[in-house]
Amino acid sequence: MEALVYTFLLVATLGIIFFAIFFREPPKVPNRGK
């Protein structure tokens, strides 16, 4: 059951970092990667 907690923590951390970068500089790049 610990693996589940660690996975959740990892995903949460990645999500927070992603959000921070995303909001720090708004997506001005034209369709990149999609």
Curated annotation (Swiss-Prot):
Query: What is the topology of this protein in the membrane according to its UniProt annotation?
Result: Single-pass membrane protein
Pfam families noted in UniProt: PsbT (PF01405)
Q: Which domain of life is it from?
A: Eukaryota
**Chloroplast as UniProt keyword:** yes
Q: Which GO terms describe its biological process?
A: photosynthesis
* CC terms in the record's Gene Ontology section: chloroplast thylakoid membrane; photosystem II reaction center
Cellular compartments annotated: Plastid, Chloroplast thylakoid membrane
SUPFAM superfamilies from the xrefs?
A: Photosystem II reaction center protein T, PsbT
Q: Where are the transmembrane segments?
A: 3-23
Query: What's the chief localization of this chain?
Result: plastid
Identify the keywords attached in UniProt to this record, alphabetized: Chloroplast, Membrane, Photosynthesis, Photosystem II, Plastid, Thylakoid, Transmembrane, Transmembrane helix
**What family classification does the UniProt entry report for this protein?**
Belongs to the PsbT family.
Cited function: Found at the monomer-monomer interface of the photosystem II (PS II) dimer, plays a role in assembly and dimerization of PSII. PSII is a light-driven water plastoquinone oxidoreductase, using light energy to abstract electrons from H(2)O, generating a proton gradient subsequently used for ATP formation.
Provide the assembly information.
PSII is composed of 1 copy each of membrane proteins PsbA, PsbB, PsbC, PsbD, PsbE, PsbF, PsbH, PsbI, PsbJ, PsbK, PsbL, PsbM, PsbT, PsbY, PsbZ, Psb30/Ycf12, at least 3 peripheral proteins of the oxygen-evolving complex and a large number of cofactors. It forms dimeric complexes.
Query: What is the name of the protein in this document?
Result: Photosystem II reaction center protein T
Q: Give the species this sequence originates from.
A: Adiantum capillus-veneris
**Corresponding gene?**
psbT
